[in-house]
Amino acid sequence: MMILSKARCVELLEMPIETINGDWRFKASPHVTTRGVTEGVALLHMNSVRVVPGKGVVSRVDRANDFLSFLYHDISRISAGTCEPRESMLAVILPIDKVEEYVAKFRRVEPFTMGGFREACRALKFSAAVGTIFDRIMKDIFNRSPTLAMDGIPPLAKGLCFVLKSRGITPIRGGLLVGEIPKACGDHCPKCGAQYATRKSRFVTEIDLVGFDSTDNTCVLIEVKTYKNSVLPIAVLKKYNTQTWINWFLFGLMYPHLRQYTKSLIAVVSPAGRVVQLFNVRSPPITRRMISAFPFLGEYCPQMRRMMTAAAMTYVIKAPFVAAHVTGTDNVSIEVFSQSNKLPPNKWATDDAARREMERTRKARYRAKNRAVADPEDSPPGKRLRRGPKSST
């Protein structure tokens, strides 16, 4: 088995099965229409997101927006002269020129109330713009853009780079286009080699960052997400996991020679809490709903689907394996931590006897509470409520 080196990884990334142009169309088949994966992921997670025409995907869970709440108070203090734009919440995630541009736009909102501020954010598509600008900064860093100035890198971008470097991950490329390749596995089995009906469109997506992990000699696909609150709900994390896994699967179709040497991560950046978190990507259950949203998944046998994302064999969403807290704007301080040294351990994790006793106590209290509030008239016919032992007197 080959041991992948960074130079070999860079060389193999230049040899996709098909080339995708900048307009997201296949170079060999420009007449074939393409589509992204965002709407399909939204259909799979309709309980947590919904698609609004003209606005994109809107979250149904975690309606609060700490980022906008903090920013509203920062703009108020800037207008009062007690705060500078570089001291605001925006300076944590955006370069200073963009901070001054948005601060000037928000200061023109009349009357400046929370409702008016949120309406201005919706009109500017502010949340999506912040995520797009941050993604572009990270892609410029990974592409070593000559136009990127060091003073234009915001603190959270420095924090993400520091976390990746601490895990042995170095940049290779930013903004890698991958797409659906029909019959990418040949005649692996009757299912993989069958002739399927040609669909009108093919899926194409962009992998935000591609790096190389020197600790295990693997190619790392990184999906960058910006989130409005400090705590990431499990429903949102599952949606991120599904989208990133689909991107990983399409990468396996496009680059079969790197398939077994690849893993994927989700990098979640939260400006409200100044936190950067990395999550491992796991394979979601392949259901009929997922195949209806992404039909190419149904054209491969379970073994080949596992081979596409070999490092994601089990579906487990866990706490971040590494994270960092970023403080300061000019002099940035980064504290890297993991769940093992940041969160207190569960005291029942190793004491089985104490855990069983706690469970018995909880069930006994639950039964006693139900007996106390139960009404005999509401009891089912033929069923008598439990009563305490009769007194000997």
Swiss-Prot record:
- Biased amino acid composition, Basic residues: 383-393
From start to end residue, where is composition biased (Basic and acidic residues)?
349-361
The UniProt annotation puts the region (Disordered) at 345-393
Q: Which domain of life is it from?
A: Viruses
Name recorded for this polypeptide = Uncharacterized protein ORF60
**Gene encoding the protein:** ORF60
